Regions:
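Membrane-anchoring alpha-helices and their flanking helix-loop junctions
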Residues: 1-105, 114-195
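Histidine-centered phosphotransfer motif of kinases
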Residues: 110-111
Length: 195
């Protein structure tokens, strides 16, 4: 693990695998952050649902939001599986021996965080909808509106900067080229050549 980044490098993290024993498992701080945001949304949802009306169309709209949330969570599992098959482990911050730039990573350097941001927006839209059709709770409404912004700022200003530093240290030339051609959150940059 490097002091500057706090992330284990692929070779050091995989040494225990070569010695025959598994590497000690730990959850990445970003997993804990994602879980915290999800739990906050569940609390807001339960609070809003408990005090709101339950007309059939309200339930149908809430079910649609629920379906979108299931797609978001399933998408994150698929992205983590994609990264895992290429030698990295997003759950424990094991950096792959080769920089992953294919699949969704060709369009976003952080597709899991992007999908989690979409998930936050869907959760917030559900809470706002329930607030509009039920009794208004200003604190719940304010939290629903602020949580996606808090997630974005925390990841953009803190988490992703640390991860970029770790990836740059592990793959200096490849990451420099990759970050010039693919946006931090989304999109290929203009004039960028394929990796």
């Amino acid at each position: 693990m490097t002091f500057e980044t706090g992330f284990p490098q692929a070779s050091a993290a995989r040494q225990s695998d070569k010695a025959g024993g598994p590497a000690p498992f730990r959850f990445a701080p970003t997993f804990k952050i994602d879980l915290t945001f999800s739990l906050a949304y569940v609390v807001l949802f339960v609070w809003t649902w408990a005090y709101g009306g339950h007309r059939l169309w309200h339930c149908a709209v809430a079910a649609l939001f629920g379906f979108l949330l299931v797609l978001c969570y399933a998408g994150k599992v698929a992205i983590i599986g994609f990264l895992d098959r290429r030698g990295g482990d997003a759950r424990t911050y094991v950096i792959s021996s080769g920089l992953v730039t294919t699949g969704l990573y060709a369009f976003s350097r952080n597709p899991t965080y992007l999908l989690t941001l979409v998930q936050c927006v869907v959760w917030s839209a559900l809470i706002v909808f329930l607030q509009l059709v039920g009794p208004l709770e200003p604190i719940v409404l304010a939290l629903a509106l602020l949580l996606p912004l808090a997630f974005f700022l925390l990841h953009d200003w803190v988490i992703i900067k640390r991860e970029d530093a770790a990836l740059s240290a592990a793959h200096p030339e490849a990451f420099a080229a990759y970050s010039k051609s693919v946006g931090r959150w989304f999109g290929r940059k203009r004039g960028a050549r394929s990796l």
